[in-house]
Swiss-Prot record:
Lineage: Bacteria, Bacillati, Cyanobacteriota, Cyanophyceae, Synechococcales
Stated role: Catalyzes the condensation of carbamoyl phosphate and aspartate to form carbamoyl aspartate and inorganic phosphate, the committed step in the de novo pyrimidine nucleotide biosynthesis pathway.
Gene Ontology CC terms, in alphabetical order: cytosol
Protein name: Aspartate carbamoyltransferase catalytic subunit
Pathway: Pyrimidine metabolism; UMP biosynthesis via de novo pathway; (S)-dihydroorotate from bicarbonate: step 2/3
EC number(s) recorded for this UniProt protein: 2.1.3.2
Biological process per Gene Ontology, one example term: 'de novo' pyrimidine nucleobase biosynthetic process
This protein's UniProt keywords: Pyrimidine biosynthesis, Transferase
Length: 339
């Protein structure tokens, strides 16, 4: 693991180097080993304050981050938008500055505005605040911790002996659904491609525009060059059946029902018929490939209950479990930067 963590803030995986990924995965694995040996809490962040600023509803991410902080012995401060000064007109940035002034070492932020964590970090840095910002999902832009835990889940599945992200090289990873409106998918594209995975995006053109073929050519803000020298590929398919036949793993995205209101789909039923994951469609692949879903699940729409509950390599609960050591690693590494 690298001796110096290079990021004060974590906004996106677009600026992660191979070594950055490996540092996170190696540390997460160490936390996994400790937990499996019966050590559920360690004093690594004792005396530090992690503040959870969630401006959007969340079950998995919010609770996972708070549990991760507690397992590192950090103090956890939870923000409730409905009872905050936001109701009096205070801006999001001023709210973040207030919590920083209270002594927050890390602000874990989720918000509906893309790139908002960049703006908050910029304000904090301008006043020389030591507070780090960790993006827990911003608009359609990015969800770094979800991308990392998804990749970690696949690495654990494919690694036969020692844990190695290199097992993803040349693997065909199928992502099904509403990529265009998914911050999770964007983070997965950066992370999977970094380790040479070949990504197949499958869905209707209204949810996966042809322009996504060039997604990896778009740098992060203020990023001059890609820190990963060679990436895997992106292809787009409109046929789920043909894509499943060649896939080594599948990531299913939640269909946001509001897309019907935007006239992006003719009907939920037709989408489910064409792109819903069923046992019958999975049988087109000769292997029992791993199935991931970031949650929450729309049972019977993008994936059937039979797949979720009975398919042997449905790893949805594994993803939830893996989120804790991954987020422990991120919180720990940010404090390492500040020290």
């Amino acid at each position: 693991m690298q001796t110096i963590w290079p990021h004060k803030h974590i906004h996106t995986l677009a600026n992660f180097s191979i070594q950055d990924y490996k540092s996170v995965f190696e540390l997460a694995h160490r936390f996994d080993v400790l937990k499996n040996a019966g050590t559920k809490k360690i004093p690594a962040l004792q005396g530090t304050l992690v503040t959870s600023l969630f401006f959007e509803a969340s079950t998995r991410t919010k609770n996972s981050f708070e549990l991760a902080a507690k397992r590192l012995s950090a103090d956890v401060q939870t923000f409730a938008p409905s009872s905050s000064s936001l109701t009096k007109g205070e801006t999001i940035i001023d709210t973040a500055l207030t919590y920083s002034a209270m002594g927050a070492d890390t602000l874990v932020i989720r918000h509906s505005s893309s790139y908002i964590t960049f703006e908050i970090a910029k304000k904090l840095d301008a006043i020389n605040a030591k507070t780090s910002v960790l993006n827990a999902g911003d608009g359609l832009h990015s969800h770094p911790s979800q991308g990392l835990l998804d990749i970690y889940t696949l690495i654990k599945f494919f690694s036969k002996k020692s844990l190695s992200p290199d097992v993803l090289n040349s693997k065909k990873i199928l992502i099904i659904g509403d990529v265009n409106h998914s911050r999770v998918a964007r983070s997965n594209l950066w992370a999977l491609s970094a380790f040479g995975a070949d990504i197949i995006l499958c869905g209707p053109k209204t949810l996966i525009p042809d322009e996504f073929i060039n997604f990896l050519k778009t740098p992060a803000p203020k990023q001059k060059e890609d820190p990963v020298k060679s990436r895997g590929s992106i292809t787009i398919s409109r046929s789920l059946e043909e894509s499943i036949k060649i896939a080594d793993a599948i990531i299913v995205l939640r269909l946001q029902k509001e897309r019907m209101m935007e006239n992006l789909l003719s009907s939920i039923d037709s989408y489910s018929l064409d792109y819903g994951l069923t046992p019958e469609k999975l049988s087109l692949n000769s292997k029992e490939i791993p199935i991931l879903h970031p949650g929450p699940i729309n049972r019977g729409i993008e994936i059937t209950s039979k797949v979720v509950d009975e398919y042997p390599n449905c790893l949805i609960n594994n993803q939830v479990a893996n989120g804790i050591p991954i987020r422990m690693a991120l919180l720990y590494l940010l404090q390492k930067y500040n020290k």
